[in-house]
């Protein structure tokens, strides 16, 4: 991570930290770097590709449940910038884990496929984003219940 700026370092650090289970940072870092090596062989600039993939998955709006007069409404709202990146990375990792369970292949390959799909604006994580935006759009008539 020598020639990277702070935003790029933060993105890689978040990817490793969200991926980590039971404190096994070295193992996770090896998986992430193997994935990046695979991306470098196919696409070229890995960091730009990863940043673009996260940008394509970032949700702009969210839906929160609010109780008004005994009825629960799905109220749309705007997602903070830090939260957008966090959700995008989390959704990419979730999608990679889902692929691993359904296809029984290595996690590096699944993460590689999901990052490429996110870069090309398709895949499981992109579908999750589209579903969230559709739900927010469908419930925009309840936006006047938003008081936060």
Curated annotation (Swiss-Prot):
Coiled coil: none annotated. The keyword RNA-binding applies. It holds the Pfam family Ribosomal_S7. It is found in: Mitochondrion. InterPro entries: Ribosomal_uS7 (IPR000235), Ribosomal_uS7_bac/org-type (IPR005717), Ribosomal_uS7_dom (IPR023798), Ribosomal_uS7_dom_sf (IPR036823), RPS7_plant (IPR034643). One of its GO terms (cellular component) is mitochondrial small ribosomal subunit. SUPFAM superfamilies: Ribosomal protein S7. One of its GO terms (molecular function) is structural constituent of ribosome. One of its GO terms (biological process) is translation. Keywords: Mitochondrion, Ribonucleoprotein, Ribosomal protein, RNA-binding, rRNA-binding. Part of the small ribosomal subunit. Belongs to the universal ribosomal protein uS7 family. One of the primary rRNA binding proteins, it binds directly to 18S rRNA where it nucleates assembly of the head domain of the small subunit. A second rps7 gene encoded in the mitochondria is identical to the plastid-encoded gene. It is not known if the plastid-derived gene is transcribed. This is Small ribosomal subunit protein uS7m. It comes from Beta vulgaris (Sugar beet).
């Amino acid at each position: 991570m020598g020639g990277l700026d702070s935003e790029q370092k933060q993105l890689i650090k978040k990817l490793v930290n969200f991926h980590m289970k039971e404190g096994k940072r070295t193992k996770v870092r090896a998986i992430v770097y193997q994935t990046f090596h695979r991306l470098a062989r196919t696409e070229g600039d890995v960091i730009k590709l990863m940043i673009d993939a996260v940008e394509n998955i970032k949700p702009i709006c969210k839906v929160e449940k609010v109780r008004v007069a005994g009825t629960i409404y799905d109220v749309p709202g705007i997602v903070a910038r830090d939260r957008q990146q966090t959700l995008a990375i989390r959704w990419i990792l979730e999608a990679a884990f889902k692929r691993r369970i359904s296809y029984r292949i290595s996690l590096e390959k699944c993460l590689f496929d999901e990052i490429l799909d996110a870069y090309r604006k398709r895949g499981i994580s992109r579908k999750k984003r589209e579903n969230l935006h559709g739900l927010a759009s469908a419930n925009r008539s309840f936006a006047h219940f938003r008081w936060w």
